[in-house]
C-alpha cells in the first residue's frame, strides 16, 4: 500500500515537472514575444477571459501589459495590437509582414483556406486583384452602381411606405435591400423581396454572423478542435454556412450551362472565363473551389456588414433625436424633397457625413478585426514574432482610441467635424481595416451607406416605442462581430 502511494506521488511529481518544463521551454522559445499572462496547458488564458465580453476582457489585459501583448485562446497563441499607433505600424508600415491570414474558426470550418477572405496572402493576392477589377467592370465606383443603389433605395422606400407607420423590425427590410446590390453584381440580377429562398439565405447569413459574436462562438474560437465534434449552436452555424455554399454552387452550375465567354453577365461568368484561360496552369488559383467561396465572401460581406451598420444607426438616431433633426435639415437644404440623393451631394453635407462616420465608429462592426498572421520572422518594436504567429489588430481599440476621439464611448458626431462645422477626417477611422488586406468592398459600402441613409431620412422620421432616454444602444453581443439589440420602430412619412 505504501509502495503504491509512493509510486503515485512520484508519478504526480514527474507530471508536474514535465508541465513546468514544457511551460519553461515555451517561454524560452517565445522569449521575444510581447508580454502577457502565463497560459495553462490546453486552456491557455481561458480563466482570464470572459467569453460574454471578450473585447472588454482583452482591453483589461491591455491595461496591465500595454498596447502590444500575447494571449492564448486555448492552444492558440496570439499577439494582440491595440490603439491606432500599433495597428497602423503593423498593417501599414509593415504591411507585407502582416499580410497573412489568421484563423477565424467558425468560417474556417467551411472555407478551409480557400476564397479571397480567409486564405493565405499568396492565394488571396490574385483573387483580390481579380475581384477589385471585376467589381469595377460591373460599375463599382462608377455611375452604374450608383444608379443600381438608387433603384434599390426606391424599392426600400416603397416597402417602408407599405408598413403605414406600423412598428416593425427593420432587420430584413435592410438586409434584402443591401444584399440586392451585391447580388446584381455577383449573380447578375436582384431578388424579389418576398422570394422565400432569398429570405432563407438572409436568415442563414444573419444566424452564422451572430453566432460569431456569442459567448459560444468565442468559446469555439478557443476549442474548435473539440467543439466541432460536439452538439451545440456551432452545428447550426455550420448548417447555415453549408446552405449558403450550396446556393452559390447551384448559381455557378447555372452559369456554366449558359456561359457566353464573349459576354460575361456577372462576377461568376467573369471568374469562369478566367478559369478557362488558366486551365492549363496547375498553380492557378482560378478553380471551382475558389470561385464558389470567393463569391460567397462577396455575397456575405456585401450583405451583412452594411445592413447591420444601418440597423444600429437607426437605433442611435432614435436615441439622439437632435442629431436626426440636424440631418433632416441638411438633407432638405442641400437635396430637397423632389429628387433622389446623389453620391456627389456628400461633399456639401458635412454633418450627414460626420453622422455616418460616427455610426460606423460607434457600432464597431468587427472589433477584433480579421485575424492576421506574420508571413516571416518579424521584428515589431522590441519584439520578435516568429513566422506564422497569429495577430489580432483590434480595430475597436482604434475606433475608440482616446488620443483621436474625445468621447470614445459616446455617440458624438463632432468627432468628425472641425471648429467651422466642416467634415474632418481621422487617422483612427479604420472600420474597413487598412493595409494589404483592407476590405475590398470599402468603396461600395461607403456609397451604399450614404445613399441609403440619406434617401430613407429624406422620406421618413424615425419613431421608437420608447422614450429616447430609455433606448438601450449597448450591443446585444460583442465577439468577432458587434450585434445590435433587436428592436421595432416606425417609419413616419415626412
Curated annotation (Swiss-Prot):
InterPro entries: Cyt_P450 (IPR001128), Cyt_P450_CS (IPR017972), Cyt_P450_E_grp-I (IPR002401), Cyt_P450_E_grp-I_CYP2A-like (IPR008067), Cyt_P450_sf (IPR036396), Cytochrome_P450_fam2 (IPR050182). Heme binds at residue 439. It is a peripheral membrane protein. It comes from the Eukaryota. Its main location: endoplasmic reticulum. CDD domains: CYP2A (cd20668). Keywords: Acetylation, Endoplasmic reticulum, Heme, Iron, Membrane, Metal-binding, Microsome, Monooxygenase, Oxidoreductase. This is Cytochrome P450 2A11.
Amino acid at each position: 500500500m505504501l509502495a503504491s502511494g509512493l509510486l503515485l506521488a512520484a508519478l504526480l511529481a514527474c507530471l508536474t515537472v514535465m508541465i513546468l518544463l514544457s511551460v519553461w521551454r515555451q517561454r524560452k522559445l517565445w522569449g521575444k514575444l510581447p508580454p502577457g499572462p502565463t497560459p495553462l496547458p490546453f486552456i491557455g488564458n481561458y480563466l482570464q477571459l470572459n467569453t460574454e465580453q471578450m473585447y472588454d476582457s482583452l482591453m483589461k489585459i491591455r491595461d496591465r501589459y500595454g498596447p502590444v501583448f500575447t494571449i492564448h485562446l486555448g492552444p492558440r497563441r496570439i499577439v494582440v495590437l491595440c490603439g491606432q499607433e500599433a495597428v497602423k505600424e503593423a498593417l501599414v508600415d509593415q504591411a507585407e509582414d502582416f499580410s497573412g491570414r489568421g484563423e477565424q474558426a467558425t468560417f474556417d470550418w467551411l472555407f478551409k483556406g480557400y476564397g479571397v477572405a480567409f486564405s493565405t496572402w499568396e492565394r488571396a493576392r490574385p483573387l483580390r486583384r481579380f475581384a477589385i477589377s471585376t467589381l469595377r467592370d460591373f460599375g463599382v465606383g462608377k455611375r452604374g452602381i450608383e444608379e443600381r443603389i438608387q433603384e434599390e433605395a426606391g424599392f426600400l422606400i416603397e416597402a417602408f411606405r407599405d408598413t403605414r407607420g406600423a412598428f416593425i423590425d427593420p432587420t430584413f427590410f435592410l438586409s434584402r435591400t443591401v444584399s440586392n446590390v451585391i447580388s446584381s453584381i455577383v449573380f447578375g440580377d436582384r431578388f424579389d423581396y418576398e422570394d422565400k429562398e432569398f429570405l432563407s439565405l438572409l436568415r442563414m447569413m444573419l444566424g452564422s454572423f451572430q453566432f460569431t459574436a456569442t459567448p459560444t462562438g468565442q468559446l469555439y474560437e478557443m476549442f474548435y478542435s473539440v467543439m466541432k465534434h460536439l452538439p451545440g449552436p456551432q452545428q447550426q452555424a455550420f448548417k447555415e454556412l453549408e446552405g449558403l455554399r450550396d446556393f452559390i454552387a447551384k448559381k455557378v452550375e447555372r452559369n456554366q450551362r449558359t456561359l457566353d465567354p464573349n459576354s460575361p453577365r456577372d462576377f461568376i461568368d467573369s471568374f469562369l472565363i478566367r478559369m478557362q484561360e488558366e486551365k492549363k496552369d496547375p498553380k492557378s488559383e482560378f478553380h471551382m473551389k475558389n470561385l464558389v467561396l470567393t463569391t460567397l465572401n462577396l455575397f456575405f460581406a456585401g450583405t451583412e456588414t452594411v445592413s447591420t451598420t444601418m440597423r444600429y444607426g437607426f437605433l442611435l438616431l432614435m436615441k439622439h433625436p437632435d442629431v436626426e433633426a440636424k440631418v433632416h435639415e441638411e438633407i432638405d437644404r442641400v437635396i430637397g424633397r423632389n429628387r433622389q440623393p446623389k453620391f456627389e451631394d456628400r461633399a456639401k453635407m458635412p454633418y450627414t457625413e460626420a453622422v455616418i462616420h460616427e455610426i460606423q465608429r460607434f457600432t464597431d462592426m468587427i472589433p477584433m478585426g480579421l485575424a492576421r498572421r506574420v508571413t516571416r520572422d518579424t521584428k515589431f518594436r522590441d519584439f520578435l514574432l516568429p513566422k506564422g504567429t497569429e495577430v489580432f489588430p483590434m480595430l475597436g481599440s482604434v475606433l475608440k482610441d482616446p488620443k483621436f476621439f474625445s468621447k470614445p464611448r459616446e455617440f458624438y458626431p463632432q468627432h468628425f467635424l472641425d471648429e467651422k462645422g466642416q467634415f474632418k477626417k481621422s487617422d483612427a477611422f479604420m472600420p474597413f481595416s487598412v493595409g494589404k488586406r483592407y476590405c475590398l468592398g470599402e468603396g461600395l459600402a461607403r456609397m451604399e451607406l450614404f445613399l441609403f441613409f440619406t434617401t430613407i431620412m429624406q422620406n421618413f422620421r424615425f419613431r421608437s416605442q420608447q422614450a429616447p432616454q430609455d433606448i438601450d444602444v449597448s450591443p446585444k453581443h460583442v465577439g468577432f462581430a458587434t450585434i445590435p439589440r433587436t428592436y421595432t420602430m416606425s417609419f413616419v412619412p415626412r
